[in-house]
């Protein structure tokens, strides 16, 4: 396993995930009867700061259809949590208009690179172009100075 599991932290994430799903109207319990489901949800609401009991609640009451989705969500959250510790693995977001993103994605696919690699290549290309333009401007000025001296 690449990322260490932190039971207390992840228990809080699981609790928040289940509460969010409940507020969105999803059935988070395996109970068919409404009163039993409501009792289980009320128990869950009281367990926010009790990680061990949250896991026990999940084992006893959680809807089995939510299990896989919750595992995926927690795995992604764990990855983001650990990647955020280091500057080089921390993800940043930028706002792009859809058409700009679409053109960037097409270029990345054509070059066989990720979006990030493509952005880096575009920046490097622009820097080389600026350097070349600066050198050409300098050469033109030097040539002009030489020709002016001879006349």
Curated annotation (Swiss-Prot):
Main location: cytoplasm
Gene Ontology molecular functions: sequence-specific DNA binding
A GO cellular component entry from the record: cytoplasm
Keyword DNA repair set for record: no
Signal peptide feature range: none
Keyword hit for Nucleus: no
Description of how the protein assembles with itself and partners: Homodimer.
Task performed by this protein: Required for spatial organization of the terminus region of the chromosome (Ter macrodomain) during the cell cycle. Prevents early segregation of duplicated Ter macrodomains during cell division. Binds specifically to matS, which is a 13 bp signature motif repeated within the Ter macrodomain.
NCBIfam families listed in its UniProt record: PRK05097.1 (NF003471)
Name of protein: Macrodomain Ter protein
